[in-house]
Each structure stands twice: as structure tokens, then as C-alpha cells.
Amino acid sequence: MGNTPMTITSESPTAVIRYTRDGSLPGANSTRYTGPVTITSSSRIRARVFEPDGSVSPTVSRSYIMLASNVRNFSSTIPVVVIDSFGGGGVPSGSFEEAFMAIYEPVGGRTSFSNEAVLANRIGIKTRGSSTGGRDKVSYGLEFWDENNEDTDFSPLGMPEESDWILYGAYNFDRAHLRLSLIHI
């Protein structure tokens, strides 16, 4: 990705565009957009248009994932899920933390990061499981979020539409996944 310029536009000639880079909602005191924003690392940009009459547009978010050099050329025959918390540290066990998820599916039999993600959206993520939460392979609960951190339904990997999902890390129990029907589909 390198140094990628990102441009924000508005159809209104009198509008002031304000944006944030920390995931917060842009407000009247947020950074004023004056020209292309340079993206040099994984970033989330949230922007709103402020009109002189006091009206404010809905928030629009864009997320950019900077992959480590050792995985940029990775490919696989199965779908790949990438989650980035933008430097947020470890995934919490209590409240959902904002993150971004992209799902890549095979094209021509191979999944590659040069393919466009089939799903790319804001999420809330947390670890789950009281007795299993400290194990080497944890499970995660996640919710697909809209611009207001409200649940929104998606259908990842051809599954039914839903907002709440589990990334199940079966580690100590049923390591062979014999009781996990998804593995046998």
C-alpha cells in the first residue's frame, strides 16, 4: 500500500468536511479536510459534511489494512478472514471493541490478498468464554456494525444473514471437530 493518498469530496460547494482517524465520530472540532490524506499504515477514516446552516451529513467510514510484508503474497484454497483493531491491542473480554473485518474468497481456486474482499465492514469484537477465555486458542464474539455502532446483518461465506457471529476456537474440547457440523458441510 505504501503512501496512498485518500481524497474526500462533497457535492456541496459550501460544505466543510471534517474527519477523524481514531474511530470516533467526526464533530465540529475534528480535523478539517483541506486536501488528500496520506495513508501510510492500517487506518480508519470517518468523515462528515458540515453545512453553514448547521446540517450535518451521516458519517462515512473507510478502512485501509496494511498487510505485513510476509503475508502480502500469501494464497490459499480456503477463504481468509482478516481482522484489524488499528493498534487497539489485545481483544477485550468485556465490551466489544471496534475493529474492521475483511473476508477474501477464492477466485480461480485461490484466495489472495490481491483479490477484492467479498465483505469488508466495521465490527465490534471481544473474546468469549469464561473457562476457555485464557486458553491458547480463544473464541471471539463479533457483531457487524453500521456507522452508529448498531448491529447490521451480513451473510458471510454464504451463511444466513445475521449481525452476531462467533469465531469458534475449539481447542481442548473436540479437537477433531467431530461434533462441529460446519466442518462437515
Model-derived features: where do they sit?
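Long, contiguous hydrophobic alpha-helical segments, chiefly transmembrane helices and signal peptides
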Residues: 47, 81, 101, 125, ...
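A broadly structural signal marking compact, well-ordered functional cores
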Residues: 105, 110-113, 134, 138-145
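Solvent-exposed edge beta-strands and adjacent loop segments
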Residues: 114-133
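Short, conserved helix/loop micro-motifs enriched in His/Cys and acidic residues
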Residues: 136-181
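Short, compositionally stereotyped local motifs that mark structural "simplifiers"
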Residues: 1-98, 103-119
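Generic detection of long, well-ordered alpha-helical segments
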Residues: 91-94, 132, 173-177
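Short, flexible loop/turn elements at secondary-structure junctions
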Residues: 12, 85-87, 105, 127-129, ...
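Conserved small/polar residues in nucleotide/adenosyl-binding loops
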Residues: 183-185
